[in-house]
UniProtKB/Swiss-Prot annotation:
ATP binds at residues 664-671. One of its GO terms (biological process) is mismatch repair. This is DNA mismatch repair protein MutS. Residues 11-25 have a biased composition (Basic and acidic residues). This protein is involved in the repair of mismatches in DNA. It is possible that it carries out the mismatch recognition step. This protein has a weak ATPase activity. It comes from Acaryochloris marina (strain MBIC 11017). The gene is mutS. Disulfide bonds: none annotated. SUPFAM superfamilies: DNA repair protein MutS, domain I, DNA repair protein MutS, domain II, DNA repair protein MutS, domain III, P-loop containing nucleoside triphosphate hydrolases.
């Protein structure tokens, strides 16, 4: 791991005794104290981590790690004597009860954290306390609830490259999801990583035994070219990624002899990636068992393809402007009541369906729920009471769940039974999935409720976990403790009467245990059987043999009680862990129902319709609306618009073209309209109702958007070059089943160049690819394309012209705009009147004398016949440009 520190990290604050050593490599190890030598040896084993070393009530760090966390966490850097010949070494620590909090902060800053725990009671240790690293926490291996975002996955990914081919595996160890795939093209791998947004990415390198972590934004020659550097990359040696070792590890984890049943028998790169990921979990989780679901193999062709640019432009999970959740499509349609439902909805949005039957199955559930307002409310109330089953099961299976987790799990499993009763008569496939809850889960819930108290403490080692009457031995211990504590409670009264000292008190502290306190003034009245234990300024403290005997009995009984309660709890947790896979299977069904109930709520309150889906190329939307923008406006303010693309040509007044040239002034709503069409199509392909009066939609294989561009400073590319790269990607990957949404192609260069590029791109999309396309532009010269290519039509965003202003009507209708109203927009923005006047003069001259304008006025306007899709080579050469 790099030791570099961000510029905004505060300067280290130091304690009174400055450290003489801040680097472990500068000290004589033989001169170190035994404890410090053990620390240094462990640090050598985990050089790329922050080693948190348990010492009593603190986790301490030393040397360079102490300096690092003092800066990163804004802690005071202290020091510790570490041998007479060595002197003081740098030290910084955190309280043991705040381990999760500080570990999360370190992980968020890109550090890996090794947890070294005490493996025995220091009070009973012979010599140096036994300590071991019990877990390594990295960005991709989080289990603790406080470290995770409840509504998004925390993926650990691993990839393997072989020429132009790659294998990818990813897992969320908190939910158990584990998937793998294999494909070609480096750019496709980059796009898949950008879709997943993994917290950590593993990849093998040829460097022997390398273990290095690249924090987000760090550059390295070891990182393969073309991959985004915004992730945390963990470089691993090739050993665990070899075919033989990876295959063997997967077979051992799942107890299989062949990978055929997992779907990856003939995907060697996918197997290597999955095996390497499992090896990393073994290395970081130590003895912690991670209950992963069976490895699932998927292909990219199963889902509608959305590249990173399209996801960003459509603002699916965050806004492109400032990256916030509010204002995204997910914000607008997420009405889920469970954390796992919200995570699943995010996955649905990022992987829309291609299978018509799957889409219609989701629609059927919404259609069934739509008229049942009261029933939906009951389901939502029930769902609201269900905790995060996926992650609760994961913590139980890994042995990290506490008693509160199991109580939450018991309550949630109990709600499943209620849910199954409510959906008993439902007919939709997704609702029927919850009609039967495995009896073993109901039995497990009853067992948990019977054993655990309703509000248990967080600690598992201080008792208070198990209900009375569960275990006779435990009840007997508790009764003995109560009896002895009652004797001590009566002791104060009895001793006051026996000694005549009215101020006598019985007290307790951890250092001395129980004691009898008498003021200094009356200490000489203490009976002979009192044994002086401690002298303070205002009091004397005594003990008696019988008091110490009772104390020992209480201590022994409590120790045995706490251990027995812990053992009983661990048994319960193990039983839950054994059912983790089954619990997660049911959780997936709950998540789907949660999503569909939420989508129904949105459909009802926003007035959505059920789109008619087909395998055709038709996109016909009546009164479509932008699902996010309309929620940001007062009711009735959003102007709906129709869209017709991709159906067979006809002689109707409103043609159904493959490509629409959309013209209109700035701020008239063109970009909003483009996004609106894309979002409606995407929502339909996740099985949702859509914001329209009606819709007939053919399934798309890809949605491409190019709406706005900015300089790519990281690669030194200008706005125009970024635009051209994105456009090239669209032209190289779009098909006749794709939906392409383009805004202002060619605006980043000279007018002639820009118009030429825009014309040729539009022409290629319409004539060669025949993709369903909306092409928004300020080049109103492109309106001429509709007269040359039959499957192109002109549409415009209407404005109302007044003598001194223009009013945007936001209505899209047939016909091309002849003006862009740029000068009017400049006037509205506050340009000086003299500048506006001069601009009008120049515009008039350009319109009268421009070669482009003159050429277009003289050009051929006879429409050409639509060519067959097979004639791809010479199509564009047959068009005679009208200038």
């Amino acid at each position: 791991m790099s030791d570099s520190v961000a510029p905004d990290v505060p300067v280290i604050r130091e304690g009174k005794n400055p450290a003489q050593h801040r680097d472990r490599t500068t000290v004589d190890r033989e001169a170190l104290s035994p404890m410090m030598r053990h620390y240094v040896d462990l640090k050598d084993e985990y050089p790329q981590t922050i080693l948190l070393y348990r010492m009593g009530d603190f986790y301490e760090t030393f040397f360079e790690d102490a300096c690092t966390i003092a800066q990163a966490l804004e802690l005071v850097l202290t020091s510790r004597q570490s041998g007479n010949e060595v002197g003081r070494v740098a030290m910084a620590g955190i309280p043991h009860h705040q381990l999760d909090r500080y570990s999360r902060l370190l992980v968020e800053k890109g550090f890996a954290v090794a947890i070294c725990d005490q493996m025995e009671d220091p009070a009973q240790a012979q010599g140096l306390v036994k300590r071991e690293v019990t877990r390594v926490i990295t960005p991709g291996t989080l289990l603790e609830e406080g470290m995770l975002n409840a509504r998004s996955n925390n993926f650990l990914a691993a990839f393997v490259l072989a020429g132009n081919h790659w294998g990818l595996a990813y897992a969320d160890i908190s939910t158990g999801e584990f998937l793998t795939t294999q494909f070609s093209e480096r750019e496709t791998l980059a796009q898949e990583l950008l879709r997943l947004q993994p917290s950590e990415v593993l990849f093998p390198t040829d460097a022997p035994d390398i273990q290095q972590i690249l924090r987000p934004g760090e550059q390295s020659d070891l990182l393969p070219e073309g991959l985004p550097n915004q992730f945390c990359y963990s470089l691993r040696s090739q050993t665990s990624f070899t075919q033989a070792e990876a295959r063997q590890r997967i077979q051992e984890v799942y107890g299989v002899r062949s990978l055929e049943g997992l779907g990856c028998e003939h995907l060697p790169l996918a197997v290597r990636a999955a095996g390497g990921l499992l090896a990393y979990l073994e290395a970081t989780q130590k003895d912690t068992h991670i209950p992963l679901q069976p490895l699932a193999t998927y292909t990219l062709s199963q889902y509608l393809v959305l590249d990173h640019q399209s996801r960003r432009n459509l603002e699916l999970t965050q806004t492109s402007r400032d990256g916030t959740f509010r204002g995204s499509l997910l914000w607008a349609i997420d009405r889920t009541r469970t954390a796992m439902g919200s995570r699943a909805l995010r996955r649905w949005l990022l992987q829309p369906l291609l299978d018509l039957n799957d889409i219609q199955a989701r629609q059927a559930a919404i259609t069934e729920l739509l008229p049942q307002t009261g029933f939906r409310k009951e389901l939502q109330n029930q769902l609201q009471k269900i905790y995060d089953l996926e992650r609760l099961a994961g913590r139980a299976g890994s042995g990290t769940a506490n008693a509160r987790d199991l109580v939450a799990l018991a309550e949630s499993l109990g709600q499943l039974t209620e849910l199954s009763h409510k959906v008993a008569k439902c007919e939709a496939q997704y609702l029927q999935a919850l009609q039967t809850v495995p009896p073993i889960l109901d039995q497990l819930a009853q067992r948990l409720r019977a054993h655990l108290v309703e509000s248990p403490p967080i600690s598992l080692t201080e008792g208070g976990l198990i209900k009375p009457s569960v275990n006779p031995e435990l009840d007997q211990m508790r009764q003995q403790i109560v009896s002895d504590q009652q004797w001590i409670a009566n002791l104060e009264k009895d001793e006051r009467e026996r000694t005549g000292i009215s101020t006598l008190k019985v007290g307790f502290n951890k250092a001395f245990g129980y004691f009898i306190s008498i003021s200094r003034a009356k200490a000489d009245q203490a009976p002979d059987d009192y044994i002086r234990k401690q002298t303070l300024t205002n009091e004397e403290r005594f003990i008696t043999p019988e008091l110490k005997e009772r104390e020992a009995r209480i201590f022994t009984a409590q120790t045995e009680q706490f251990q027995l309660e812990y053992d009983l709890f661990v048994t319960l947790r193990t039983e839950v862990g054994e059912q983790a896979s089954l619990i997660r299977t049911v959780a997936a069904a709950v998540s789907a129902v949660d999503i569909l109930v939420g989508l129904t709520e949105v459909a009802v309150y926003q007035g959505y319709c059920c789109p008619t889906m087909s395998d055709s190329r038709e996109i016909q939307i009546l009164d479509g609306r932008h699902p996010v923008v309309e929620q940001s406006l007062p009711p009735g303010f959003f102007v709906p618009n129709a869209t017709e693309l991709g159906s067979a040509p006809s002689a109707e007044l409103t043609p159904h073209p493959d490509l629409v040239i959309l013209t209109g002034p700035n701020a008239s709503g063109k970009s909003c309209y483009l996004r609106q069409v894309g979002l409606i199509q995407l929502m339909a392909q996740i099985g949702s109702y859509v914001p329209a009066q009606s819709a007939r939609l053919g399934i798309c294989d890809r949605i491409f958007t190019r709406v706005g561009a900015v300089d790519d400073l990281a690669t030194g590319q200008s706005t125009f070059m970024v635009e051209m790269n994105e456009t090239a990607n669209i032209l190289n990957h779009a098909s006749s089943k794709s939906l392409v949404l383009l805004d202002e192609i060619g605006r980043g260069t000279a007018t002639f160049d820009g118009l030429a590029i825009a014309w040729s791109v539009a022409e290629h999309l319409a004539a060669v690819i025949q993709a369903r396309t909306i092409f928004a532009t300020h080049y109103h010269e492109l309106n001429e394309l509709a007269s040359l290519v039959e499957n192109v039509a002109n549409y415009q965003v209407l404005v109302k012209e007044l003598p001194d202003q223009i009013i945007f009507l936001h209505q899209v209708c047939p016909g091309g705009a002849s003006r862009s109203y740029g000068i009017e927009a400049g006037r509205l923005a506050g340009l000086p009147p003299s500048v506006i006047k001069r601009a009008k003069q120049v515009m008039k001259q350009i319109e009268q004398h421009s070669k482009i304008a003159v050429g277009l006025r003289k050009g051929n306007t006879q429409p050409r016949a639509r060519k067959s899709s097979a004639e791809t080579e010479a199509k564009t050469q047959q068009f005679e440009l009208p200038f």
